[in-house]
């Protein structure tokens, strides 16, 4: 089931219809959420929004679209987050891999969603631009290579003006790393 508070674009309605996925637009019917086993939340929806608070009160798991897509990919993931430079870094990595003949996709906060990319393609590598909002609701997500470009006070309205909460969201990119994964960061940034 898919719900959109606004109007769903025609091209996405066609995808939903073609895959026999029920949907609603222009609002949310709470009972439909309350019957869900899990909710995949758009990163633009705050964890403090009324609907999310109500869903959480029913102990229904809420995950991000990034977490959802992660369950269905075998691609080697390179995740990039930070306050500035994400798009440039992702574009450069994508260009380098593509120029070297690798099968590589680009998704997340740049281009298509990770879910759409995963459903439509089978790339060897996927470069993901990841905002703090996209990382807020990850559970098992684990890129093989994680990059944090830098950290500056940004989007603090989403984090109750708490910079450390914002930093914690960014560091979720490595929360499931093991000794076989890689973490690249800006050593000159004293916030990392």
Enumerate the predicted regions with their spans.
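NAD(P)-binding Rossmann-fold cofactor-contacting core
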Residues: 1-14
């Amino acid at each position: 089931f898919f719900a959109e508070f606004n109007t769903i674009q025609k091209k996405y309605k066609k995808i939903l219809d073609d895959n026999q996925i029920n949907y609603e637009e222009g609002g949310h019917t709470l009972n439909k959420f309350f019957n869900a086993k899990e909710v995949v939340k758009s990163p633009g929806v705050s964890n403090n929004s009324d609907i999310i608070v109500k869903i959480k009160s029913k102990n229904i798991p809420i995950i991000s679209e990034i977490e959802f897509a992660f369950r269905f990919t075998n691609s080697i993931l390179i995740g990039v987050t930070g306050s500035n430079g994400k798009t440039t870094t992702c574009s450069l990595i994508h260009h380098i891999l593509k120029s070297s003949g690798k099968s590589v996709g680009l998704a997340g906060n740049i281009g298509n969603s990770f879910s759409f990319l995963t459903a439509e393609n089978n790339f060897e590598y996927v470069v993901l631009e990841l905002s703090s909002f996209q990382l807020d609701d990850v559970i098992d997500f684990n890129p093989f290579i994680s990059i944090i470009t830098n950290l500056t006070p940004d989007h603090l309205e989403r984090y109750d003006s708490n910079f450390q909460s914002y930093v914690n969201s960014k560091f979720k990119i490595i929360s499931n790393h093991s000794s076989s994964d890689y973490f690249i960061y800006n050593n000159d940034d004293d916030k990392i």
